[in-house]
UniProtKB/Swiss-Prot annotation:
Family stated for the protein in its record: Belongs to the aerolysin family.
Species of origin: Staphylococcus aureus (strain MRSA252)
Lineage of origin: Bacteria, Bacillati, Bacillota, Bacilli, Bacillales
Compositionally biased region (Basic and acidic residues): 33-60
Entry keyword Signal: yes
Keyword Zinc-finger: no
Signal sequence coordinates: 1-32
SUPFAM superfamilies: Leukocidin-like (SSF56959)
Region (Disordered) residue spans: 26-74
One annotated Gene Ontology cellular component of this protein: extracellular region
Full protein name: Uncharacterized leukocidin-like protein 2
Record keywords, A-Z: Signal
InterPro entries registered for this protein in UniProt: Bi-component_toxin_staph (IPR003963), Leukocidin/Hemolysin_toxin (IPR016183), Leukocidin/porin_MspA_sf (IPR036435)
Length: 351
């Protein structure tokens, strides 16, 4: 009888252990699925925050700061989002009242987000039917519209920058003096400073050589792109390539490396921070500025299936831009949007 009880107890324990093991396996599987889902739903938090703030646009409420004894700064912020291009412009206008200077002074900080619009597409009518469109270049353009009394005197960033993070500070001192330095910080109580800071890993910032006192342009261009253990240059047709034996026309993503391994500017997008210092003759009451944000896309084309085909790379093949015209009232220190529109199939081209 005792032996039967022992057998029964042992059998019961075995069942319990099997049930616990199965439950543990199921829990681990559920946990992994949850982690994978969280990973898949990851989107650049900075961009989402920018979009939520679009409803707060046209913040034309004065916010003066002191510069020395008599200088004042009045701040305005205007945000415009374009659904068609998935681009957000967020501009900060800082009006500087300097009683020791004979001109109006304005600092314009261009922020917002240019979403990557990363796409995998199937094109059955082509041999290389699996396509990947990715953002190879981001562009920000700033122009003074037909007004000789308003001039651009300085900008940040300048020249070419290849570091993963860009940090710079512009300082304005009473009397119309200005300077810029690397890093973030304020200089003294007699000056006003404005900083920029943004990430551009695997990309380079290039200030256009055509910049002048009416026009500035910045390009943020892909260089050597790192994804997982791979590093390939933008000019390499095998960029993001994956063995295509298991891929099909119906699943173009299988012809490329997993998108969750791509650099942030490829996977999510770019959050610009560019600065322009502007002076205006006090006899001029209003000035219009045209601001353009552009996304250029390269197209990578792979042939799905077991029959190998040479990849195809087409650079700056597609692009989208969002243009906004802002009018500045120098006397009242206000800003309003007077025009805005967007274009498809309009990649930026130099010249």
């Amino acid at each position: 009888m005792k032996n039967k009880k022992r057998v029964f107890i042992a059998s019961s324990l075995s069942c319990v252990l099997l049930l616990l093991s199965a439950a543990n396996t199921e829990a681990n599987s559920a946990n992994k699925d949850s982690q994978d889902q969280t990973k898949k739903e990851h989107v650049d938090k900075a961009q989402q925050k920018e979009k939520r703030n679009v409803n707060d646009k046209d913040k034309n409420t004065p916010g003066p700061d002191d510069i020395g004894k008599n200088g004042k700064v009045t701040k305005r912020t205007v945000s415009e989002y374009d659904k068609e291009t998935n681009i957000l412009q967020n501009l900060q206008f800082d009006f500087i009242d300097d009683p020791t200077y004979d001109k109006n002074v304005l600092l314009v900080k261009k922020q917002g987000s240019i979403h990557s619009n990363l796409k995998f597409e199937s094109h059955r009518n082509e041999t290389n039917a699996s396509w990947l469109k990715y953002p190879s270049e981001y562009h920000v353009d700033f122009q003074v519209q037909r007004n000789p009394k308003t001039e651009i005197l300085d900008q940040l960033p300048k020249n070419k920058i290849s570091t993963a993070k860009v940090d710079s500070t512009f300082s304005y001192s009473l009397g119309g003096k200005f300077d810029s330095t690397k890093g973030i910080g304020r200089t003294s109580s007699n000056s006003y400073s404005k900083s920029i800071s943004y990430n551009q890993q695997n990309y380079d910032t290039i200030a256009s050589g055509k910049n002048n006192n009416r026009h500035v342009h910045w390009s943020v261009v892909a260089n050597d792109l790192k994804y997982g253990n791979e590093i390939k240059n933008r000019n390499d047709e095998f960029l993001f390539y994956r063995n295509t034996r298991l891929s099909t026309v119906e699943n173009p993503e299988l012809s490329f490396a997993s998108k969750y391994r791509y650099p942030a500017l490829v996977r999510s997008g770019f959050n610009p921070e560019f600065l322009t210092y502007i002076s205006n003759e006090k006899s001029n009451e209003k000035t219009r500025f045209e601001v353009t944000y552009t996304r250029n896309q390269d197209i990578l084309k792979n042939k799905p299936g077991i029959h190998y085909g040479q990849p195809i790379l087409e650079q700056n093949k597609d692009g989208q831009r969002f243009i906004v015209v802002y009018e500045v009232d120098w006397k009242n220190k206000t800003v309003k949007v007077v025009e805005k529109y967007s274009d498809q199939n309009k990649p930026y081209k130099e010249g």
